[in-house]
From Swiss-Prot:
It comes from Desulfovibrio desulfuricans (strain ATCC 27774 / DSM 6949 / MB). This is Phenylalanine--tRNA ligase alpha subunit. It catalyses: tRNA(Phe) + L-phenylalanine + ATP = L-phenylalanyl-tRNA(Phe) + AMP + diphosphate + H(+). The lineage of its organism: Bacteria, Pseudomonadati, Thermodesulfobacteriota, Desulfovibrionia, Desulfovibrionales. Its cofactor is Mg(2+). The gene is pheS. Gene3D superfamilies: Bira Bifunctional Protein, Domain 2. Pfam families: Phe_tRNA-synt_N (PF02912), tRNA-synt_2d (PF01409).
Length: 345
């Protein structure tokens, strides 16, 4: 059999193979067998040099014609197989099945809790104030009874930009700015980001605080206790117990730490006989710091000596962790949608 006959004989063989091909994968294997670099057409054409020169053009033309016919047969069969696959898929499609709702974003849990806290205090008559995150040393320290070389400055690792400019270490500078521009009576809460040179498993260089201030005539510790007790019970439940412990802050006197009954174990110190990992068996967890505003702070902002007031501050991430039982602070900063999606409203 000469080469032209061999080439022509491949077409009916291919047609038979195509009729038996039932998948795109099988079709591709057949294409490689006939048209591949080492396929059957290539094997026949490898014998072309053995022919006389005058016979080669006819064989070459036949080879090109056979390749074109084979490609046309492949494309036709490929289209038929794809159409069959799509038709089969449509048979399984049920238009009555509800569609999948697109994933919707949500506010970060820190933002949700910050808004909730501000909402509680707004209900108690407080305004919401804000101020710069890049702050002057005067407002961050000196106006809050912490002059240069004051030992209380060692309590905070500060990120300085220049000798007199820094990243605020708390939101209390906004309280000083507010008092310089407003006369009592006043009541404000100040949410925002703060920065400290601290980074480990339980601390981050940037976190969120909410600090509050109330100033007026006759403001005393009873007002402070009533306000913060109402706040804690609004966030954690009406049966939450609250206690105040003596403490020290340079801009309040007297000062106190506020503890609440553990929200994990209900203040029992244990859960089903096992020690509570949140309160470490004490039944109490620290929630915020507070105190009566030091007269030196009022003097720095030009207030009369007959006014009094209280201030308080808390870390929003800590409140969020206690409220939702989150055990790892790093989860707030990893942007894992599996975590964030749990707080969708």
């Amino acid at each position: 059999m000469d080469l032209i006959s061999a080439l022509e004989g491949l077409v009916p063989e291919l047609e038979k193979g195509l009729d038996q091909a039932s998948s795109l994968e099988g079709l591709e294997a057949l294409r490689v067998d006939f048209l591949g670099r080492k396929g059957r057409i290539a094997q026949i054409m490898s014998r072309l040099p053995s022919l006389a020169p005058e016979q080669r053009p006819a064989v070459g033309q036949t080879a090109n014609s056979v390749k074109e016919r084979c490609n046309a047969l492949f494309e036709s069969r490929k289209g038929a197989l794809k159409a069959g696959r799509e038709a089969e898929a449509l048979k399984r499609f049920d238009p009555s099945v509800p569609g999948r709702a697109p994933w919707s974003g949500t506010l970060h849990p820190t933002t949700l809790v910050m808004e909730e806290i501000c909402g509680v205090f707004q209900g108690l008559g407080f305004d919401v104030a804000s101020g710069p995150e890049v702050e002057l040393d005067y407002y961050n320290f000196e106006a809050l009874n912490m002059p240069p070389e004051h030992p209380a400055r060692d309590m905070q690792d500060t990120l300085y930009i220049t000798d007199k400019v820094l990243m605020r270490t708390h939101t209390s500078p906004v309280q000083a700015r507010t008092m310089l521009h407003r006369k009592p009576p006043l009541a404000v809460v100040v949410p925002g980001k703060v920065y400290r040179r601290d980074s480990d498993l339980t601390h981050t260089p940037m976190f969120h605080q909410i600090e509050g201030l109330m100033v007026g005539q006759g403001i005393n510790m009873a007002h402070l206790r009533g306000t913060l007790t109402a706040f804690v019970r609004a966030i954690f439940g009406s049966d939450t117990r609250v206690r105040f412990r003596p403490s020290f802050f340079p801009f309040t006197e007297p000062s106190a730490e506020v503890d609440m009954s553990c929200c994990m174990c209900g203040g029992q110190g244990h859960i089903d006989g096992s020690p509570c990992r949140v309160c470490k068996t004490t039944g109490w967890v620290e929630i915020l710091g507070c105190g009566m505003v030091d007269p030196a702070v009022f003097e720095a902002v030009g207030y009369d000596a007959d006014v009094s007031g209280f201030a308080f501050g808390m870390g929003v991430e800590r409140v969020t962790m206690l409220k939702y039982g989150i055990g790892d602070l790093r989860m707030f900063f990893e942007n894992d949608v599996r975590f964030l999606g749990q707080f969708a409203r």
